[in-house]
Structures are given as C-alpha cells and as structure tokens.
Amino acid sequence: MSIPTGHRSNATRGGWPNSDVVRCNAGAPRRCPRVLCFAGFQSTARRMIKFDLDQYTPPVIADRDALVTWLREFHIDEVECLMPDINGVMRGKIVPREEFIDALASDGLRVPETALIQSVTGESDYYTRVAAEVDQDIYMTPDPATVRIVPWYECPTAQIICDAWTKNGEPVDFAPRAVLRRVLETYAARGLKPVVAPEVEFYLVEKNTDPDMPLGVPIGLSGRREAGRQAYGIEAANEYDAVVNLIYDYCEACDIQIGTLAHEAGPAQLEINFRHGDAMSIADQVFLFKRVA
C-alpha cells in the first residue's frame, strides 16, 4: 500500500491562532495538558486538537529573529529543545516560550555532558571513555531551520533540534549532528555530496502497561490479530489504516518527507521510506519521525 505524503484522515481541522482550543499563558509554571488524538475519533471528555497543515507547517526559518517572530505569531506556549544522544534517543528540555527566547540571546540552555552519552536504558557508567571525567555542562544551541509544531499536543507547542557546544564555543565532538557534519565536510572536500533516502521499519504493538508481560500484536480493522508472515501484503497493511493515516498527517504537519509504505515480514511490522534528500536534513527528519510513530 502506497500512501502519498498529502494523504488526509477524517480528523477535524482548524487553526491554533483563531480556533477555540484552550490556550495557556506563555511562561506560566503550570504545564499545558497533553493529549494524543486519533484520526476520526473525538473524546467526550476532551476536545480533539484542531490544526491546519498549511497554516502550521512553518516556512524556512533561517535566523533567530524570524524564529522569535514565528513563535509569537502562532502563540506557541512551550518549546521542546531536542538533541539526539549517541544512540539516537531524544534528550533535552521543555522551556516556556519567553524563557526560550531569552535563552536565544544568551549562551543557550545548559545540560550535563553525560546527557548525550547514555545507553538506551539510561546508563552512563562508562562515559569517561568519551567525555571529560568531570560532568561538565554543555550548551544547547537551537537550529532555527528545524523548528516544527508538535501536532498532537492540546496547547500550541514547538519542537526544535539543537546543536551541542562547549563553553569554549566549540562543537561537542561526540554529538551526533557534529559527527555527521564532519563526515559531510569530508565528502565536500572531495567535491561530493551524499544524497540519502533511508527506510524505517517498526512494529505496532498492543498497549501494554505491565513491563513483566510480553508485547502483543494489536487487533486490526478486521477485529483479528495477525498470526503469520505477510511480507508486502496489501490487506495486511490495510489492517492498520487508522494509525497509518495519523502518522502521515503528523509527518506532513512536521514537514517530514515520507513516501511509500509496505508491510514487512513480521506481524504488524511496517516499513516507511523517506524521500531522497540532504543527509543532515533527512537525519533530522528520521530523528523526529521516531517520536511521531
């Protein structure tokens, strides 16, 4: 099954600046309520988020002034400042809008260096093999071109990818974006530019709140669970249309350039292909896609 990037679900759409979605006061200590909304469904207890994909896919923002203007124009309440650690896990801070704007005019937001050197389970016992023996601070510097909305939140919230810098103004050499940048510079020195198009494979699983229980295969639209292998099965892929449509809608809102979808060999295992593009841009998109899916 191939679904174009512009695929639409049945979700109700509106727009944050002019909609009746409850807004929070920027900078207030109270955190905004969060809710994950499923395409085509509306909770009686809480209104489903309304967003306009054309209105909320931000233009290319090249500098800090344009970023500040966009944050205020679209009534962004909080900014999620994100960095990938060495395993690609999302690390960072959630900052009220005006505090984030203040940080743009200073050295940026500080995090401990070990934040980037954790295992997938959060262990960092061996970080001194990579970083300094002292758990020193590093600085998160937002890349304005990466700012996107978080379309599944009730309050207007932005997400932005940050680079990591030392107090001496040098890039943190083991930060993933810095590593990739050095690789790209090596290619550029030889007159080459990588063009990449990764594919991401993942499993859909039944909701599980008990860590002692194994993950299960979810029930599809037919009311049944997959029991065998269905590589490239069309009907097998269609079993999960509701969540697939939602993924494509959220990717469009976040300007994540995905294309073809296929069912892989495992039960409820899907594969989504990214469109060809610049290596850094695609790496950023894959990083954001992992939280979308």
Q: What positions do the PLM features span?
A:
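Short, conserved phosphate-binding/catalytic loop or strand-edge motifs used
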Residues: V200, E264-I272
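ATP/Mg2+-dependent ligation/transfer catalytic cores
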Residues: M48-T260, I282-L288
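Extreme N-terminal basic, low-complexity initiation segments
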Residues: S2-T12
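Short, Lys/Arg-enriched N-terminal segments with co-localized hydrophobic residues
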Residues: L36-R47
